[in-house]
Amino acid sequence: MKCVNVRERLIDNAIKVIAANGLDKTTTKAIVSGTDINEAYIYSNFSDKEELLARAFDSLDEELVSKLMLHLPIMFTPGLDRESRSRMLFTSIWTFLMGNREKCIAFIRYYYSPYFIKYSADDHKLRYRPAVEMFSSVFADEADVWMILNYILDVMLSFAVRVHNGHMREEDDYVEHIFRVIYRSVEQYFKKEENSNDE
């Protein structure tokens, strides 16, 4: 087995197990179950199970921030009002969350766990620095952009997990409501645009 391939498969399997069973039941045995990978490969590729879980979260987090950075230029599209631009960005990220149930649930379970604070919080903040820098030109100078981004992510993840768990249906009016909750909460922090009708 190629080392890189095994490492990637272990990360993928860890994501699947976290999503299916939660972190408490994500044992090394469960991670390799149903594969031809021996448990020992976990310790030859990672220092311990905790590092494997952290790298699995890194993989998910990198994919999410990559998606955000891909669509973030929408916020600077000329000819559209700020709310329309914000809705387009929101829709892009929401569609990604809805289209990746397993990854979304695994992300949420790790993000709100003690593992995140202990192993991943610092790297997570560094990973989002480019997004914070881009958003800084949209928000007023006194706004805490990192806090605002965390709030937006928290709200989107909270509603996304409700949809994925079947507690709420993904309907157009429901999605619009989520957007409005977020937009109305943060619009007070936007920098005033010249020649804009935004209030």
Per-range role (PLM):
Residues 6-15, 31, 56-60, 64-68:
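Generic hydrophobic, amphipathic alpha-helix propensity
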Residues 9, 17-51, 55:
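Helix-turn-helix
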Residues 11, 87, 91, 128-136, ...:
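An amphipathic alpha-helix signature
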Residues 56, 60, 64, 68, ...:
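Hydrophobic recognition helices of helix-based DNA-binding modules
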Residues 65-69, 114-150:
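Amphipathic alpha-helical packing segments from all-alpha helical-bundle domains
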Residues 92-118, 161, 165:
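Amphipathic alpha-helical segments used for helix-helix packing
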Residues 105-109, 136-182, 189, 193-199:
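Hydrophobic/aromatic-rich alpha-helical bundle segments in the mid-to-C-terminal region
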